[in-house]
Amino acid sequence: MKFSELWLREWVNPAIDSDALANQITMAGLEVDGVEPVAGSFNGVVVGEVVECAQHPNADKLRVTKVNVGGERLLDIVCGAPNCRQGLKVAVATIGAILPGDFKIKAAKLRGEPSEGMLCSFSELGISDDHSGIIELPADAPLGTDIREYLKLDDNTIEISVTPNRADCLGIIGVARDVAVLNKAPLQEPEMAPVTATISDTLLITVEAVDACPRYLGRVVKGINVNAPTPLWMKEKLRRCGIRSIDAVVDVTNYVLLELGQPMHAFDKDRIDGGIVVRMAKEGETVVLLDGSEATLNADTLVIADHHKALGIAGIFGGEHSGVNGETQNVLLECAYFNPLSITGRARRHGLHTDASHRYERGVDPALQYKTIERATRLLLDICGGDAGPIIDVSNEATLPKRATITLRRSKLDRLIGHHIADEQVSDILRRLGCEVTEGQDEWKAVAPTWRFDMEIEEDLVEEVARVYGYNNIPDEPIQAGLIMGTHREADLSLKRVKTMLNDKGYQEVITYSFVDPKVQQLIHPGAEALLLPNPISVEMSAMRLSLWSGLLATVVYNQNRQQNRVRIFETGLRFVPDTQANLGIRQDLMLAGVICGNRYDEHWNLAKETVDFYDLKGDLEAVLDLTGKLGDIQFKAEMNPALHPGQSAAIYLKDERIGFIGVVHPELERKLDLNGRTLVFELEWNKLADRIVPQAREISRFPANRRDIAVVVAENVPAADILSECKKVGVNQVVGVNLFDVYRGKGVAEGYKSLAISLILQDTNRTLEEEEIAATVAKCVEALKERFQASLRD
């Protein structure tokens, strides 16, 4: 939003300079992007009149003029501008004048004719880039008046960034309101008295889309002179706001747009067939716009139409057929309130961005239309003449926005600002903002003004009070809070400790999306029900994950595709499982999962290449589980998981409760996911492990330990873990260590059986064990194994 500082000061004129004004606007939340003078630095340029204008005797493109600047004599000035003519009021740089670029005017001869000055164009005075001709001033411009004073060139253009919530500041009136509030200054609105209708002409207006267009005002103005020149003061204001003058009718609608922030449109009334209809477009309907382009419309686009065709896209762009041209005599002025949702996105769909769409998308004051159409009518009649009919009002109060009533509590205000503002100041600020305020016990009820449709909740009022009070007036206060010592349970095992261990073992932590591809998830968890997102980022991210494996395996594939074949990664995060017993029907479990693949070690000249296997991952996992103090209660049991190899996987149990899985990815899944080589995964429900068993200190025996090795033959389907567990149970007082150190199948062992070599470490804390005691304990272990598993000692 760009505007003239002097135009703003016509509405409100605080006793501060330009820099202070710009800083104040910025601190109020409307960031000033730039302040620039409207003209270059010059002096000695005055208003003059061309009294005589004759052809230069020695040059075809030059003219010899006599110019009256209000002095004792006429000045002889040679001019080359094509629009120079007798009777024209012009800007004259007299001898001694200094123009932008330090260009000094001196008496000279041009092709033999004396020249005592220069007739200036806008570009020569640094006002604009227009160098097509000299400046043409109004006929009533007083001779000899300094041009800076006459055109009010001691002015600045101020450009601000208007945030989407402050659409009310997309007009001079909105910025002026804020400046008036900040300075406690009166707002001086220009006179906008209603225009008395001098004709009774109207036009039938029908609003079919009442939700999209709650209010539509129209007014017929007949007998205008569309070719009447736009006054220089209006052209200058438009120029300083970055708007090029086109013709009087368009200039008037642009002027009120900039002044009040309300878009308008003018139709050639004689080219409207039957009347105006505000409706939704028909699918595939076309309209030729004012720029000559053809737009093909969708059924959700609001259009202004007559009884046979669309005349334009509502709130965005008018149509060529009903546009005002040089032959127009009768116009229909349109001023409407369109629901922002009916305009949003439609302009971009057709590659358009107009001042009107910019404002309508953000919202305009629903109570501003009457004031705007009266203002535009008066300006149009003053410039183009003609007669105005009555205002045609088609409004639907039920669909117009309602003013919000908001309660502001003293406790909320003080808590969010961190500073106490006196009650009377709060009330005064709210009233200056345009709110209707009712004061209560430690609270205020405020009805937001129609132009502040961004005021909806209590926090909005807190923001407004702080903004107007001045952020710089809120003192810095150190935060005061009691120091509360956090409780620490020795039994709590932090994930940070687990992550550190995995890092030490060469794993890298990754974070993957909770949104996964439902097709991939079905491959990993066939038949499992997942939560599907109603509005996903993409189809490939439309399901909530049932485990962390989806993201981890995708990460492995990503790395393998980039020649990273040795991968060790882990992740902690939530899985989302549909569960009717859980809150909102979703159970969220904190999981710890990891993946390894590739070589066991980094490439080294002294190490043979060995691919990781089940026991590499199991060993790493046991190290993690050992941190919990529950490793002794952990069992790995053969159990089917559709994502894992049936012969190289296991379920992980904590006592009798399953808490996870470990194993090699199923070859079929490996193929479908494009994994390169054997890949191993694990996953644990971390919440079931986080409460660790605190280690108990115990005496270290001073007596020697004894090792005895036994080899027992058992059926192939007997888990080695059960054998070890049974040995520990039998020798609970004296067996301090049990370890499986060899598994043998082959000669001497019947098919379907295996030989397990087990070491038993026996030790007592009070005495040295006798050989008889050791032998008896070993015999008890062998007997227990024989009884439970039909084990036999291998010869």
From Swiss-Prot:
Location(s) in or outside the cell: Cytoplasm
Predominant localisation class: cytoplasm
GO cellular component, one term: phenylalanine-tRNA ligase complex
Domain named tRNA-binding: residues: 39-148
Cofactor(s), names only, from the UniProt record: Mg(2+)
Catalyses which reaction(s): tRNA(Phe) + L-phenylalanine + ATP = L-phenylalanyl-tRNA(Phe) + AMP + diphosphate + H(+)
Residue ranges annotated for the B5 domain, each copy included: 401-476
Binding residues for Mg(2+): D454, D460, E463, E464
Domain FDX-ACB: 701-794
Subunit structure: Tetramer of two alpha and two beta subunits.
Record-given protein name: Phenylalanine--tRNA ligase beta subunit
Organism per entry: Salmonella typhi
